[in-house]
Amino acid sequence: METSSNLSSMVRLNIGGKKFCTTIDTLTIREPDSMLAAMFSGRHAMCQESKKGYVFIDRDGKHFRHILNWLRDGVIPSLSDPDCSELLREADYYQLLGLKDGIKDSRKEVGEVEAELTRIDIIKCIQTERVRFRGVNLSGIDLSKLDLSLVDFSYACLRNVFFSRTNLQCAKFRNADAEGSIFHNAILRECEFTSANLRGALLAGTNLQSANLQDACLVGCSFCGADLRTAHLQNADLTNANLEGANLEGANLKGAKLSNANFKGANLQRAYLRHVNLREAHMEGANLGGANMTGAIR
């Protein structure tokens, strides 16, 4: 039988519509400096749903069970690269530093070869006028929040690199292997990604205006809310990519593969979609005003 103290320590959470039940101890002990610990420390009044007492948090609840399991037992889950990238994004939002470090360490362990440079090495290099990392292996390192504009990463191995909030304007990623990397909220205006491998990469919230992604592998990428205005996506493989809410106004998707791609709520005004197969793409709520749809399969 549960005591009144046990009942009072229980917390009911509604994370983007998914319901969870846990305890205050779980939310506060392992990661005491996290946003969740701050929310349930008793220092703040919590707004609950009137009937059942759920605390609502406006986030995607898909991976929150992994967050709870981490807070309970400290075990890093084994996930695919896209799911791992999404979990890392959630850990970043909730300020779960231990979980972030654990995910990054686990991704480094699965890498075949260690990175040839460290974050400190990169910071030293970018003090010079012209920086090139062509063909260099930088897999798994944290390059978040740096100014790497104009840097040449062509042919580099950038698997699972953390580029969150990094300024990469006009950087070159030609033929680079950036599978599973995280570019969340990065500045990628006018970047060149021709023939790059970005399979499973997280590009949600990025600024990709006028970026060149021709012939790139974008399978399973997340572009949710990204700015892709006038981007070049000719012959890119967007199979299973998520572009929900993205802005693709004036983008060129000639010859792009869009099987099972999600364009729900996306802005495709004046986009170039000639002879593109949209039959297996999800277009609910997409704005196609003025788009060139000549020969498109719908």
UniProtKB/Swiss-Prot annotation:
InterPro entries: 5peptide_repeat, BTB/POZ_dom, Pentapeptide-BTB/POZ_domain, SKP1/BTB/POZ_sf, T1-type_BTB. Gene3D superfamilies: E3 ubiquitin-protein ligase SopA (2.160.20.80), Potassium Channel Kv1.1, Chain A (3.30.710.10). Residues 9-80 form the BTB domain. Residues 129-165, 166-203, 216-255, 256-295 form the Pentapeptide repeat domain. It comes from the Eukaryota. Keywords: Repeat, Ubl conjugation pathway. It holds the Pfam family Pentapeptide. Interacts with FH1. Pathway: Protein modification; protein ubiquitination. It comes from Arabidopsis thaliana (Mouse-ear cress). This is FH protein interacting protein FIP2. The gene is FIP2. May act as a substrate-specific adapter of an E3 ubiquitin-protein ligase complex (CUL3-RBX1-BTB) which mediates the ubiquitination and subsequent proteasomal degradation of target proteins. One of its GO terms (biological process) is protein homooligomerization. The BTB/POZ domain mediates the interaction with some component of ubiquitin ligase complexes. Expressed in all tissues but preferentially in roots and flowers.
